[in-house]
Structure formats: structure tokens, C-alpha cells
From Swiss-Prot:
Record-given protein name: V-type proton ATPase 116 kDa subunit a 2
One CC-aspect GO term: intracellular membrane-bounded organelle
Matching Pfam families: V_ATPase_I (PF01496)
Complex and partners: V-ATPase is a heteromultimeric enzyme made up of two complexes: the ATP-hydrolytic V1 complex and the proton translocation V0 complex. The V1 complex consists of three catalytic AB heterodimers that form a heterohexamer, three peripheral stalks each consisting of EG heterodimers, one central rotor including subunits D and F, and the regulatory subunits C and H. The proton translocation complex V0 consists of the proton transport subunit a, a ring of proteolipid subunits c9c'', rotary subunit d, subunits e and f, and the accessory subunits ATP6AP1/Ac45 and ATP6AP2/PRR.
Length: 856
């Protein structure tokens, strides 16, 4: 938790890598994930860097592996994924691996090409057999005539044509037969009629079964056609039209004997093709199964090798071109591991001269490194979505672990809904090692990544549901109500007390639709409910009024405490960066302004709750009126909450008024005095540099990175650094804007926390409406079929509860909780202007196959 409170101390290290050991050293660093490399070749194009050839080789290997994975998936062969990630391949094995993969690719492409060719031939032969079978039905004559006109028996019997004319026509008859897509038949026929001007006779028949297209592989419906024409020119036109409509044209036999011979030959060839195709597929599957055993490790190895060469391209060579120089950011705590990794890489390469490192001082801002685990990672991502924390500033994620699910639960307070959410998150946590959860759809994967957030959100919702005493909009009476209805009846009290109290009798109960419990009557109110809200309020008509008052005050209290805590965290930042003047001139005035107004409001709320009981609540003054009178100084005196209230409030207002000019002018005037009193403004006593930032505070402290076990000490700052330009007007304007924003933000941010009350009220009302419209109707059915009606009612109630109250309302409360943390809480102390530490780590490479048959 210590590292989660503040980012780790970083140092800039210079690595000296021998050319022969650089690959092995970076492989060892990638396995450990210790350092973030700086690009020392920013001015060099990516195509002109030293190891661009090796990167292209890795990309070529990736292309081959993607092809292999696609073929393996196409063959429905499972891809084994190992639990342990294989190391990067040694350099001496890279060429061998490349040759193996290229040879395997050539073999697979050749076998696949032959298989596709065989399959295409087989489909064409099957189409040919279907065409012969169907066109045989077009022939209506059993006696063979001349082959050029045997398909037109009607020509002989036509009274308009004599036999000699038929012979002249028959001498020029021709036939085109084949198959055409079902959707193109109508257009094909119209085109033939218009182009050939009626000099064709077309016969169609639909195939009973769908066939696979040899070209596209799509299974579609086909029509067999037979076109009879006369004239060579008409024949050329018919063939061109068939080509335009992508018809599959096959030779048409002239005689029945020729048809039989072709049919027998086709059957033989089809059987032979089936045999050859099966053997080819078996061989292809054997090759793919053998390739599938090692493709996972090959993919990971190639990706690691490519990542290593990308990092090597960020290094520079020394003057002798025998040593690579790299600059890396490394946490102080990992320096020893970094040295051991370099030694390990040098030892594996067998180099005589080991690689080594050196710590170099720098004035640059280091990246922010915050160590997380699977529990804290989700909360850290919420903070980083707003902005990565500046180097060494307080990290809000440590406190967000508790405050975020708690504020969510305040808006989502329902025992039943929270318990359902808790069970769902618990199921994800218990099955977090299941491989399918990481490969699920994006929405489910998002739930899985935030499983611990959901777990705490559900757990805290159970707690707030107990406080609100809400379980699916109904109250639970666990300890017995603190209110006694029977004590209101006149029969419960002596006759002498009847005139002093407003009691009930049978007539009052019959003639009044609304009855009021009086806590001043003895025995009516026996004390507060042990846990949460008394269940009797669920029956009261003024329940909403009571809950609104309670939740509104609770929202204000939580909001002011949350914001005050943010200001206090800012003090830790000032102490760490040794800017104590910010504590006295910024943080303390901010705290005084906040506490003297809104802190006093919390005091009045708690004072009224503690001093005035249920019996004396009638005479309790209004907090709203008292708070308004605090600023108006009315002439008419009120009773007030306590003695001396007026003097206390005036003192608080005076302190508030005095804190505002200090907040506006204190820091700029102090910096002006500091500037005039020193010849060099850039350095303070601890060697921290004061640099002004444009978007944040004009002055912030950045430590000189002399952190190699205290060996480097900061000498005279005025001799080391140039003096910074001091602009008093800009500093004053920045501080004035910040002060105005803070003073107005105290009011607007406090009002913003009222969303806790608003969303809690909305959630409770939606739950109540859903219960009233479904469950209440189903439970009131007292017929013999009531049980049958109750089952679909419960099912519908469960579905609407999940989709409306859990998902939609939960998402709304989640977004509002994020806003309260980002805006109202973090702007009190969190700058969020840093850069995230992105280590060179092989663990960041995905080890799962994606839907595109690759590993991302």
C-alpha cells in the first residue's frame, strides 16, 4: 500500500550493451519488465534505423504464422495455448526457424492449391453430370435424327414448313448448355431474346439440390439451360452472353450414345477425384496438426523478437560501433534486478565483456510508476482515466478503493440489489482463471476486468441497504420497531391524562384516514432502531419527506468530508515537495474557508440530531433558517441552537473573510519577496527546481534525479542552473483564478454532492414502482391459478430488476460516482499531468489468439 500512496522513485540509467550481447540482455529485461526505454533516435526515420532489416524479417515471419493459424482454424484443428510463455529464440536459431516456416508455408500453399484445384474439378464434373441428366428430359423423340436438329421434333410436324426447309435450317443448328444462377435466369432470358431477336429456343429446369459454386464456394440454387440456335453469328452472341452472366457452359452431346459414354467417363473421374481429394485432405490435416503443436510458441517467440529489435532501434551506437547505448527509466527498487538481468544476458551470450549500467543525473520529469495487483488495478484505471498522476504526488487510487464503492452504494442503497450484484461479482472472482472469460465479448470482458470493483460496490450496497432498510423497496423488521401504536389509544393511559394529550379512540380511528404518532406521549417512542431506519417509516405517508431530509443532510455531510479530505491530501503533496509556504498560504486558508462555512453546517446538523430528541423535535429550530441568518445578520433574534451562537458565527465569518485575501495574495507576494531576496530563484535549499507550468500551478518542485544511493549531492544551485524568469503578473493572475475557482467550487461542489440524495431517491422510487406494478399484483391473486400467474410475474420482475435497476441504474450511479471523484475530490489536490511508466515487458504481449487468427 505504501507504493500505492505515492508513485515510486525513478532514476535515469544508461545501459552499455555489447553488440554481441544486446539481444540477450534485452530478452532478459523483457522477461522481467523493469525499465522503460527512451528513444535516442527520434530524428531518425524508422526505415533508416540499424535493425530495420531484422524487424522486416519478424514481420515476414508473422505473416507466415498468421497464414498458418488461418489454415489451422479453417481445418477446425484446436490451437493449443500453453500456460507458460516461451522465451525469445536465441539468435542462432532464428535462421533455422525462418527456413522451417518458409518451407512449411510453401508446402501448405502447394497442397492447398492442389486441393482447391481438385475440388474445383470435382464440382465442375458434378455440375456436368447434373446438366446431362436434366437436359436428357428435354429430348422428346426417341428416334435419332440428324444431330443438328434432333431437339426440335416439332419442325417436322409443322404445317408451315416443308421437310426441305427443315433440312436447310437444321444444317445450321447449334446448342449451348450449362448452368446459371437462379437469380439471373429472368435477365438472362430477356438478354437472349433482345440480342438474338428470337433466333434462339431456351429450355430451363431447376436442379433439385443446391450445388457449391466452384469459383466462390457458395452453395446456391442452379438452373440447367439448353439453348438451341441457328447461325454462327447467333452462336457467338449466345456464348458471349453466357460469359457475361457467369454461366457454367459444358459441351452438349450430339447423340444418346455419346451422352452415355460421357456419363460413364464422368462417373469414373468423379470417383477417382474423390479418392485423390480425400488423400490430399488427410495429408493436409496431418501437416496442419503437426504445425499446430508449435504455432503458439512460434507466434509468441516472433513477437518477443520483434519487440526486442524495436527497442534496439531506440538505442544509439558509440563511436566504435561496437557498443549500444540505451537510456532507460527504472524504479530505484529495481536497480539490483536490472544489474542481474544484464549479467544474465551477458552470461547467456557467452560474451567476455559484460554489459553494465550507470546512473545519470537529469532534470527531466520521470514517468509515474505505481505498482498494482489484480485487486487495485481497476481502481487505478479509474484514476488514470482522468489523468496519470504527476511524478511522486499523492495517488487518489488508494482512497478510491473505499470511497468509490461507498459513494456508489449511497446512490444504489438496496440490500437485495446489492446482494445480487455481489453474487455476480463473486462468481467472476471465483472463476477468474477460466480461459473463456478473457476471450469473451467486449462487454463481458469489461465486467470481468472490473470484477473487484463490482464486488465492493455490491458489498457496500448491502451495507447502505441495511442503513436505508430497503430490500427490493420493502423494509425488513429485524429488531422490532421503536414506535408503539397501541400507546396512542386512550385506554392505555389514565383518564386524568386524557385532556393533556391527543389520544386515539375507535371514533378517531374510523373517521380519520391519516393518523399521527406523537412521540411526546409516554410509551409511543421507545428509542431508535438498532440498525438503520425504523421499518415503520415504510408505512408512513410522510416517509418520503423524512427520507429526503435524512438523505439530503447525509449527502452534504459526506460531500464536505470528502472535499476536506482532498484538501488535506494536498498538504501531503506540499510537504513531500518541500513547499511549506503552500501549506500556510494555500492549504490552511482553503481549510478555514471550507470548515468555517460548510464545516459549521455539519456541526449544526449533528448538534440538532444529538440535542433534540423525538419528543422535543417540534421546538427544534430550522437549520436552513439558522444557516441563512448566519450571513444576513437579521435584526430579529431567533432562539438559536445553543447559547452564544451569534458570537460564534460572527467569529467564523471573520475568519472566512480573512482567509480569502490570504488565499488571493499570500502566495504571489511571498514569491515576489522570495525573488527579490535572492539572486537566483530557480533553486531552493534541497536542490529542487522551481519551474512554472502553464496549465497547473505556476510553481512546482521537481527533484534532481541524483538517487544512486546518495552518492550524488546537489551543489550550489545557482552555479548549476540558470535563473528562471519571474513574472509576478502571471503568477498573481493564476493564483486569483485558482482562488476564485476554489471559493465558488466549494459551493457548487457541495451542491453537486446532492446527487447522492437525488439518485438514491430515484432508485428507491423505481424499486417501489416496479414492486407495486408487478409483485403486488401477482401476490394479491388469491384464486386457484394464483401460483401459475405468480411464476411469470416473478420472472418478469427479475428481468426488469436486472436490466433497469441493476444495469441502467447501476451504470448511472457508477458514472456519477466517477464524476464526484474526478471533479469534486481530485481537483482539491490532484494535478494528474504525468506520463505513465510503460515498461518494456513481454507480459504486455497478448498470449491469446484473437478472432482475426492472430495474437495481438
Amino acid at each position: 500500500m505504501g507504493s500505492l500512496f505515492r508513485s515510486e522513485t525513478m532514476c535515469l540509467a544508461q545501459l552499455f550493451l555489447q553488440s554481441g550481447t544486446a539481444y540477450e540482455c534485452l530478452s532478459a529485461l523483457g522477461e522481467k519488465g523493469l525499465v522503460q526505454f527512451r528513444d535516442l533516435n527520434q530524428n531518425v526515420s524508422s526505415f533508416q534505423r540499424k535493425f530495420v532489416g531484422e524487424v522486416k524479417r519478424c514481420e515476414e515471419l508473422e505473416r507466415i504464422l498468421v497464414y498458418l493459424v488461418q489454415e489451422i482454424n479453417r481445418a477446425d484443428i484446436p490451437l493449443p495455448e500453453g500456460e507458460a510463455s516461451p522465451p525469445a529464440p536465441p539468435l542462432k536459431q532464428v535462421l533455422e526457424m525462418q527456413e522451417q516456416l518458409q518451407k512449411l508455408e510453401v508446402e501448405l500453399r502447394e497442397v492447398t492449391k492442389n486441393k482447391e484445384k481438385l475440388r474445383k474439378n470435382l464440382l465442375e464434373l458434378i455440375e456436368y453430370t447434373h446438366m446431362l441428366r436434366v437436359t436428357k428430359t428435354f429430348v422428346k423423340r426417341n428416334v435419332e435424327f440428324e444431330p443438328t436438329y434432333e431437339e426440335f421434333p416439332s419442325l417436322e410436324s409443322d404445317s408451315l414448313l416443308d421437310y426441305s426447309c427443315m433440312q436447310r435450317l437444321g444444317a445450321k443448328l447449334g446448342f449451348v448448355s450449362g448452368l446459371i444462377n437462379q437469380g439471373k435466369v429472368e435477365a438472362f432470358e430477356k438478354m437472349l431474346w433482345r440480342v438474338c431477336k428470337g433466333y434462339t429456343i431456351v429450355s430451363y429446369a431447376e436442379l433439385d439440390e443446391s450445388l457449391e459454386d466452384p469459383e466462390t464456394g457458395e452453395v446456391i440454387k442452379w438452373y440447367v439451360f439448353l439453348i438451341s440456335f441457328w447461325g454462327e453469328q447467333i452462336g457467338h452472341k449466345v456464348k458471349k452472353i453466357c460469359d457475361c452472366y457467369h454461366c457454367h457452359v459444358y459441351p452438349y452431346p450430339n447423340t444418346a450414345e455419346e451422352r452415355r459414354e460421357i456419363q460413364e467417363g464422368l462417373n469414373t473421374r468423379i470417383q477417382d477425384l474423390y479418392t485423390v481429394l480425400h488423400k490430399t485432405e488427410d495429408y493436409l490435416r496431418q501437416v496442419l496438426c503437426k504445425a499446430a503443436e508449435s504455432v503458439y510458441s512460434r507466434v509468441i517467440q516472433v513477437k518477443k523478437m520483434k519487440a526486442i529489435y524495436h527497442m534496439l532501434n531506440m538505442c544509439s551506437f558509440d563511436v566504435t560501433n561496437k557498443c549500444l547505448i540505451a537510456e532507460v527509466w527504472c524504479p530505484e527498487a529495481d536497480l539490483q534486478d536490472l544489474r542481474r538481468a544484464l549479467e544474465e544476458g551477458s552470461r547467456e551470450s557467452g560474451a567476455t565483456i559484460p554489459s553494465f549500467m550507470n546512473i545519470i543525473p537529469t532534470k527531466e520529469t520521470p514517468p509515474t510508476r505505481i505498482r498494482t495487483n489484480k485487486f487495485t488495478e481497476g481502481f487505478q484505471n479509474i484514476v488514470d482515466a482522468y489523468g496519470v498522476g504527476s511524478y511522486r504526488e499523492v495517488n487518489p487510487a488508494l482512497f478510491t478503493i473505499i470511497t468509490f464503492p461507498f459513494l456508489f452504494a449511497v446512490m444504489f442503497g438496496d440490500f437485495g440489489h446489492g446482494f445480487v450484484m455481489f453474487l455476480f461479482a463473486l462468481l467472476l472472482v471465483l472463476n477468474e482463471n477460466h480461459p473463456r472469460l478473457n476471450q469473451s465479448q467486449e462487454i463481458m470482458r469489461m465486467f470481468f476486468n472490473g470484477r473487484y470493483i463490482l464486488l465492493l460496490m455490491g458489498l457496500f450496497s448491502v451495507y447502505t441497504g441495511l442503513i436505508y432498510n430497503d430490500c427490493f423497496s420493502k423494509s425488513v423488521n429485524l429488531f422490532g420497531s421503536g414506535w408503539n401504536v397501541s400507546a396512542m389509544y386512550s385506554s392505555s393511559h389514565p383518564p386524568a391524562e386524557h385532556k393533556k394529550m391527543v389520544l386515539w379512540n375507535d371514533s378517531v380511528v374510523r373517521h380519520n384516514s391519516i393518523l399521527q404518532l406523537d412521540p411526546s406521549i409516554p410509551g409511543v417512542f421507545r428509542g431508535p432502531y438498532p440498525l438503520g431506519i425504523d421499518p415503520i417509516w415504510n408505512l408512513a405517508t410522510n416517509r418520503l419527506t423524512f427520507l429526503n431530509s435524512f438523505k439530503m443532510k447525509m449527502s452534504v455531510i459526506l460531500g464536505i468530508i470528502h472535499m476536506t479530505f482532498g484538501v488535506i491530501l494536498g498538504i501531503f503533496n506540499h510537504l513531500h515537495f518541500r513547499k511549506k509556504f503552500n501549506i500556510y498560504l494555500v492549504s490552511i486558508p482553503e481549510l478555514l474557508f471550507m470548515l468555517c462555512i460548510f464545516g459549521y453546517l455539519i456541526f449544526m446538523i449533528f448538534y440538532k440530531w444529538l440535542v433534540f430528541s423525538a419528543e422535543t423535535s417540534r421546538v427544534a429550530p430550522s437549520i436552513l433558517i439558522e444557516f441563512i441568518n448566519m450571513f444576513l445578520f437579521p435584526a430579529s433574534k431567533t432562539s438559536g441552537l445553543y447559547t452564544g451562537q451569534e458570537y460564534v458565527q460572527r467569529v467564523l465569518l471573520v475568519v472566512t473573510a480573512l482567509s480569502v485575501p490570504v488565499l488571493f495574495l499570500g502566495k504571489p507576494l511571498f514569491l515576489l519577496w522570495l525573488h527579490n531576496g535572492r539572486s537566483c530563484f530557480g533553486v531552493n535549499r534541497s536542490g529542487y527546481t522551481l519551474i512554472r507550468k502553464d496549465s497547473e500551478e505556476e510553481v512546482s518542485l521537481l527533484g534532481s534525479q541524483d538517487i544512486e544511493e546518495g552518492n550524488h549531492q546537489v551543489e550550489d544551485g545557482c552555479r548549476e542552473m540558470a535563473c528562471e524568469e519571474f513574472n509576478f503578473g502571471e503568477i498573481l493572475m493564476t493564483q486569483v483564478i485558482h482562488s476564485i475557482e476554489y471559493c465558488l467550487g466549494c459551493i457548487s461542489n457541495t451542491a453537486s454532492y446532492l446527487r447522492l440524495w437525488a439518485l438514491s431517491l430515484a432508485h428507491a422510487q423505481l424499486s417501489d414502482v416496479l414492486w407495486a406494478m408487478l409483485m403486488r399484483v401477482g401476490l394479491r391473486v388469491d384464486t386457484t391459478y394464483g401460483v401459475l400467474l405468480l411464476l411469470p410475474v416473478i420472472a418478469l420482475f427479475a428481468v426488469l430488476t436486472i436490466f433497469i435497476l441493476l444495469i441502467m441504474e447501476g451504470l448511472s450511479a457508477f458514472l456519477h460516482a466517477i464524476r464526484l471523484h474526478w471533479v469534486e475530490f481530485q481537483n482539491k489536490f490532484y494535478v494528474g499531468a504525468g506520463t505513465k511508466f510503460v515498461p518494456f515487458s513481454f507480459s504486455l504481449l497478448s498470449s491469446k489468439f484473437n478472432n482475426d487468427d492472430s495474437v495481438a
